[in-house]
C-alpha cells in the first residue's frame, strides 16, 4: 500500500482535489481510501471518552492530545492496510496549524513515524487565488487567513514543516499546484506520484 499525505492551507481546494482523486481512482479500479485526519481524531476522542464534541479536543491537556494524535494515526494505518499492496491511501491533514501562540507542526514525529508516507504533498495556489476562494466559501470561518501576506507565510511554514517530517521517515515532498478551474490536474498529479 502506498500512503500519501495531502496538506494545504485552508482555501487552497484540498477537499475538492481529493474528491477528484477519489473519482479518478474509482474509475481506474484502484483500491483506495481518503482518510481525514481530523475526523479520525474526533472519532478516536469520542470512542476513548476524552470528549463529547470536536471543540473540546483543543482544550485537552497537551499529553492527552499527543496520545490522541498517535491513536488516530494508528487507526488510519489499520484502515489503510486493508487496501492491500496495490492500494493507495490519501490522508487529508495540515502540515502546520496557525494558532495565536505560533505555528504547530501538523505532522510531528509521533504521528509521521506511524503514518510513514511515501510522499507528503503540499497543495498550493497563488495566495490571491486562495483569498478569492475563501471569500466564495461561506461555509467556513477563515478570517485568520484573510490576507495574502499571512497566506504566504503559512505556505512557507508548511513547506518547512513538511520537509522536517519527511526527513524522519524518508518520504519525498512534492508541491502540487491547484490550478484555478481544473482541480483534476492536481488530483492526477498526486495519483501519478504514488503509482
Swiss-Prot record:
Name recorded for this polypeptide: Adenylate kinase
Keyword Kinase appears in the UniProt entry: yes
Gene Ontology terms, MF aspect: adenylate kinase activity; ATP binding
Record field: catalytic activity: AMP + ATP = 2 ADP
Gene: adkA
GO cellular component entries: cytoplasm
Binding site for ATP: 8-16
Species the sequence originates in: Saccharolobus islandicus (strain L.S.2.15 / Lassen #1)
Location(s), subcellular: Cytoplasm
Enzyme Commission number: 2.7.4.3
Membership in a protein family: Belongs to the archaeal adenylate kinase family.
Keywords from the UniProt entry: ATP-binding, Cytoplasm, Kinase, Nucleotide-binding, Transferase
Top EC class, one word: transferase
